[in-house]
A protein has these predicted regions:
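Periplasmic alpha-helical coiled-coil/stalk elements that build and connect Gram-negative outer-membrane
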Residues: 2-7, 40-43, 171-287, 387-390, ...
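Bacterial Sec-pathway N-terminal export signals of envelope proteins
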Residues: 32-116, 218, 256-300, 311, ...
Length: 438
């Protein structure tokens, strides 16, 4: 009984260690973070967010190659590495990151000349001979100054890249945690099955002894009957544990992309054993917080862009037109190929209130993004505090269970001696002490 309780407590503590490790899982990542990341919640401002764009790095310590085949004994590190390098959720997140990275090039392209060509076909009363004169047109538009329209679009796209990078880390973190948690469940049920088998074997020995004593007239038939009932109960518990073990093995195999998982090693990395001992959470190592910061930077860039849209855009507009016949205006004095270039200043005067509404929407989105940053930081700290409290409680419980186990083993030996040699202890006491409690 005490071994079972100790094993169950150990399994819960084991699982909690993985949860705590998830909070600090990417401590070794190279994260280029500025000082404004360490601002308190009350100091988060739109201006501060716009000053620097911090991109979380996806490069870190090199991991061991992922296993291509199912090993005979799977460790937690091997399982996590295999899941990270195989899982489709991570591949999906990386694909979205590459897509967003291309959006940065799309935004930067507006800094360069925009060249277009085409053909005009139409009638005009300024043309002779029925007013028809088709022409080829080549035009170039080069933005000279736009009050931050393009630059804010670039910052918005770069913030989107930062957010997708953080989302990749979130996906990796989630897959790693879920895989490790499933493996810990397998470890726990492997131990429970082993203990249940030992318990069943011990009860069967007691049953053989009870039947022998009954045959010799030293004990009643009820002792053997009670033992048989306990044996069947132990078989039921063993069957339940084995079913749960098979279920968690199947779950783990799904995370790893394998048809099955054989034996799981009971070893646990020492580096994760004290993961909950961090004094405080570091925002630069928490993917969810990084994603919230990037979202706030993107919202700030969109607000700047909305304001810039209400200001003029100055551009250089050269154009070449080549007419295909002589019916164009002033064809007697002008060559078929005509050139023009002008500096264009354009700004919206009235758009039905749409631009003002867009600016207000961007401002509200920025307010929501700032709140999301605070929420992500608060949630991370809350999870760490809860995990630390549970870790301390389970560590104390493990120590108590270890003492109970030692006392229980001594008591069991004493009860067996009193039953077998002195006859002063009833068999029911021996059975109760050997009973498995779930």
């Amino acid at each position: 009984m005490d071994r079972m309780q100790s094993s169950a407590t150990y399994r819960r503590s084991f699982k909690l260690s993985v949860l705590c490790a998830g909070i600090a899982f990417f401590t070794t990542s190279s994260l280029a973070a500025g000082s404004d990341l360490m601002q308190s919640a009350s100091q988060i401002t739109a201006t501060g967010l716009a000053k620097q764009q911090d991109l979380p790095s996806l490069t870190g310590e090199s991991a061991e190659p992922a296993l291509a085949r199912v090993p005979d004994s799977l460790t937690i590190n091997q399982a996590v590495q295999r899941a990270i390098q195989w899982h489709p959720d991570i591949a999906e997140a990386v694909g979205k990151l590459l897509e967003q990275a291309d959006q940065v090039d799309v935004a930067k392209a507006k800094y360069y000349p925009q060249i277009s060509g085409g053909m005009n076909n139409g009638y005009s009363n300024s043309y002779s001979e029925k007013g028809y004169s088709p022409s080829f047109v080549l035009s170039v538009s080069q933005m000279l100054y736009d009050f931050g329209k393009v630059s804010s679009s670039v910052r918005s796209a770069e913030a989107g890249v930062a957010q997708q990078q953080a989302n990749v880390l979130v996906s990796i973190d989630t897959v790693a945690h879920d895989t490790a948690a499933a493996l810990v469940q397998v470890q726990g049920y492997q131990q429970l099955v082993k203990i249940a088998q030992e318990q069943l074997s011990a009860l069967m020995k007691i049953g053989d002894l009870a039947r022998q004593r009954n045959n010799e007239g030293a004990a009643s038939l009820s002792d053997a009957t009670q033992t048989d009932a306990r044996i069947e109960g132990a078989r039921t518990v063993l069957t339940q544990y084995q079913a749960n073990l098979d279920r968690w093995r199947a779950t783990l195999a799904t995370y790893l992309g394998w048809p099955l998982v054989k034996k799981v090693s009971d070893d646990f990395p020492a580096s994760l054993a004290r993961s909950c001992d961090a004094a405080k959470s570091d925002d630069r190592t928490i993917p969810a917080v990084l994603a919230a910061w990037a979202q706030a930077n993107e919202a700030q860039a969109k607000l700047d862009n909305a304001n810039a849209q209400m200001l003029p855009t100055i551009s250089l507009e050269p154009q070449v037109t080549h007419y295909l016949n002589n019916h164009y205006a002033s064809s007697e004095t002008l060559d078929r190929t005509q050139y023009s270039a002008w500096v264009k200043v354009e700004m919206p005067l009235y758009q039905g209130g749409g631009m003002t509404a867009s600016r207000n929407a961007a401002a509200n989105a920025l307010t929501a993004a700032n709140a999301a940053v605070n929420s992500a930081r608060l949630k991370a700290r809350q999870q760490l505090n809860e995990s630390q409290s549970q870790s301390q409680s389970l560590a104390l419980s493990l120590a108590i269970q270890a003492r109970q186990q030692r006392l229980g083993e001594k008591t069991q030996e004493l009860y067996q001696d009193q039953y077998l040699q002195l006859g002063t202890r009833p068999l029911l006491d021996v059975l109760n002490l050997s009973l498995i409690h779930i």
